[in-house]
Amino acid sequence: MSTIDLIILGSLYQSPKSAYDLQKQIESRNLSRWIKIGSFTVYKKVVQYENKGYVVSETVKNGNMPEKTMYTITAKGKEIFNEMMVQFSLAETRVFLDFNAVIVNMALLDESSADACIANIKNSIQNTKMQIAEQLPTHKDIPLFGRTILEQQFLLLETLEKWEENFEKELAKEREEK
């Protein structure tokens, strides 16, 4: 089971939802920035959960609206959710950054190309930090458990900015010594 499973089951633990409603909630909480999940994945997951007995489905129709399938978490699903909460809270903290693959291979590039990649990484860190900084004031009214993730990401990006500045200085120093 993955963090995606934990997020989807957690959402269904709060209240029954359709796959579409789950996807919209993931988007509205900006969770798609932190986990890779698409609408087809959500649909595929709820079908898997139903086959495993974690959720039950019910097709409902409201007025003139088209039918939709609502998913409700079962006792077994709640048990799995609770087990995953413990499992993930005990897991080793790992930080995966796609740009680390660029850093590892940077020695294979000429200086100009390497500098361009560094500038791209720097811009990406700064842009993401700015986006989160803009969101923080507007999210003061959301519950602590959601707001704290934004704050965590902002602090991590500040640390990455410092790391990137150090990396540039060390690289410049290494180039001077050659």
Question: What do these predicted regions represent?
Answer:
Residues I125-L136, L157, E164:
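Non-transmembrane amphipathic alpha-helical segments
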Residues I132-E151:
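Acidic interhelical loop/turn segments
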Residues Q14, K44, N120, Q152-L155, ...:
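DHp/HisKA dimerization-phosphoacceptor four-helix bundle of two-component histidine kinases
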Residues N82-N127:
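Amphipathic alpha-helical dimerization/coiled-coil segments
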Residues M1-E92:
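Basic helix-turn-helix/winged-helix DNA-binding cores
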Residues M106, Q135-K140, L171, R175:
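Secondary-structure edge/capping motif, primarily at the C-terminal ends of alpha-helices
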Residues G146-K178:
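Long, low-complexity, charge-rich intrinsically disordered regions
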